[in-house]
């Protein structure tokens, strides 16, 4: 990667998240907007990326072909859909480009493809790029070690009506952080739905509840409930800009890294706390 500014390409440039990513890339020192991508046939092709994001003219036009811009970026930032992200991953692996992946909803095969690609390129892959959420994940590990063996653990998440996967990637990351702290596998202890005559709560499980409504950016709560008291740890996002800033910060952090799979805890050095 280049020693000067890190040049980033933004996937899904015309979407809600894509526009925020463009704004964040233009604002962060050490980062240069190198390319912006949209799907073939989009009415936004040929638009100036900065003007599209409400940030003024940049001279970077929205393209549909990665081949056309492969010499214009060092790190590809992708918050799109799993199938599109995996296509972009193959291209970046072939051409030695770093990636920041904020796409959620991957199946196990998709996650394995990301792990495999990290043998050749540097990737930051996270369910949530908010600093606050990642601090919360660390707090959940600590709380689980103290309270997890004797409390009922529930994770409640809420997002806007347009979100297509459930539970959210962040909710799953919360469950994984708690399960890991308890030396469990989330696959063995997660309960994703309750309906009808369920019987009493099974001890040692981690429950998930999902809300989809309106324009909620993202709210997540983990509950450790006992008889007589409960601890709740909550994060609420009021703007997608917090995710965009974290993603662009991650792209900058990848400077000088040739390969490896990282997450926001690496970027923020939370593993040493």
UniProtKB/Swiss-Prot annotation:
Induction: Expression of dapB is up-regulated by ArgP and is repressed by lysine that prevents the binding of the ArgP activator. Thus, ArgP contributes to enhanced transcription of dapB when lysine becomes limiting. GO terms for biological process: amino acid biosynthetic process; diaminopimelate biosynthetic process; lysine biosynthetic process via diaminopimelate. Its main location: cytoplasm. Its EC number is 1.17.1.8. GO terms for cellular component: cytosol. GO terms for molecular function: 4-hydroxy-tetrahydrodipicolinate reductase; identical protein binding; NAD binding; NADP binding; oxidoreductase activity, acting on CH or CH2 groups, NAD or NADP as acceptor. (S)-2,3,4,5-tetrahydrodipicolinate binds at residues 160, 169-170. It is found in: Cytoplasm. The keyword Amino-acid biosynthesis applies. This is 4-hydroxy-tetrahydrodipicolinate reductase. It comes from Escherichia coli (strain K12).
